[in-house]
Each structure stands twice: as C-alpha cells, then as structure tokens.
C-alpha cells in the first residue's frame, strides 16, 4: 500500500515517542483515534510492514492490534527521524515516584481509632479464622476415636449384600437369581 511520506512520519513519530501503538481492527475507520489526519488502515499496514522487519512486536486482543517497539525498531526510527541517542521512547523512561506517603495520608476521611497492643483489627471475623475449635454442633474434627469399628448396615434384607451392580437389590439380579 502506498502511504504518503507525511503520514509515515506522523506514525513513526508517535510510535517512537510512546514506544507502543494500538489500532482497532476497522479498516474503514477514516482516522486513527490518536494520530490526527492519518487513516486507520495506513497505521495498520505500516505496522504490518514494521512487524515483518521485526521493528515491532504485535499482539491482538479484543479486536485491537497492539504494537510494541523493539530495540531494532528504536535504532531504525532514530535514524529515520534523525534523532539523537539521548531521546528514548516513553516505555524506556523511568517513571517519577510521587513524593509523599504512598497509601493515603491527609485526605478528607477521618482515620479510625488507634489500635491497642495486640488488638485485632477485624475482631468480628474471628469465628472464620483458623485455630483451635470447640466441639460445636458436629463434634470434634480431630478424627475418629481409636476403638471405632465402622460397619455396613445395608438393607436389601436377604441374600448376599454388596455394592454396585452385584447388590442384588431391585429385581433379584445375579446374586439371588432363580433363573435356569
């Protein structure tokens, strides 16, 4: 596809500045949402070209293309756009850490009462927490006593008792069969 030099430069500038680019998979979209006056189709086609040259890495999810600039792509765009080596994409810049406390501080909401020594924060939930439990409704959960003898108190009342198909329950079956 023939892409004008101005559109190619606009796409390349945006890609180098941000380090990433996305486009909706809509070839009829008249303009890309982030790059002014460039059709969405031209963005997709230029990125396909960059992908084949391994300048970008492509991911597709939820009807959107996502392209991430590679090191080779950074070198290519730096020479194409005549940029010095001090300028780097936004994805390679270290983010500034905010000054101040990380988890709140100040704010409109009043803080709760201070906790005493050893006091649990969520005392109403202690029943759900682990630890030693009392006997309760179902007894101790430690296990069966040592002298416990389990037994089967089955019920077909007569002949041979068993499990599954050999039980001889409904209709006689194989165990108590009177058939010749």
Curated annotation (Swiss-Prot):
Protein name: Small ribosomal subunit protein eS10y
Protein's GO biological process: axillary shoot meristem initiation; regulation of secondary shoot formation
Ranges of compositional bias, category Basic and acidic residues: 108-128
Location in or out of the cell: Cytoplasm
Pfam families for the chain: S10_plectin (PF03501)
GO molecular function, one term: structural constituent of ribosome
Native organism: Arabidopsis thaliana (Mouse-ear cress)
Annotated gene: RPS10B
GO cellular component term, pick one: cytosolic ribosome
């Amino acid at each position: 596809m023939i892409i004008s030099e101005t559109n190619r430069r606009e796409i390349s500038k945006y890609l180098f500045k941000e380090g990433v680019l996305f486009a909706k998979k809509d070839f009829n979209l008249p303009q890309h949402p982030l790059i002014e006056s460039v059709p969405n189709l031209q963005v997709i086609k230029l990125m396909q070209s960059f992908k084949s040259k391994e300048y970008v890495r492509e991911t597709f999810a939820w009807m959107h293309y996502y392209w991430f600039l590679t090191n080779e792509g950074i070198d290519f765009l730096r020479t194409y756009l005549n940029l010095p080596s001090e300028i780097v994409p936004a994805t390679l810049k270290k983010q500034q850490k905010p000054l101040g406390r990380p988890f709140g501080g100040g704010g409109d909401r009043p803080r709760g009462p201070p906790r005493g020594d050893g006091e649990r924060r969520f005392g109403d939930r202690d029943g759900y927490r682990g630890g030693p439990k009392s006997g309760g409704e179902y007894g101790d959960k430690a296990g069966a006593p040592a002298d416990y003898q389990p037994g089967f108190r089955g019920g077909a009342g007569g002949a041979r008792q068993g499990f599954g198909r050999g039980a001889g329950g409904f209709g006689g079956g194989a165990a108590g069969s009177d058939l010749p």
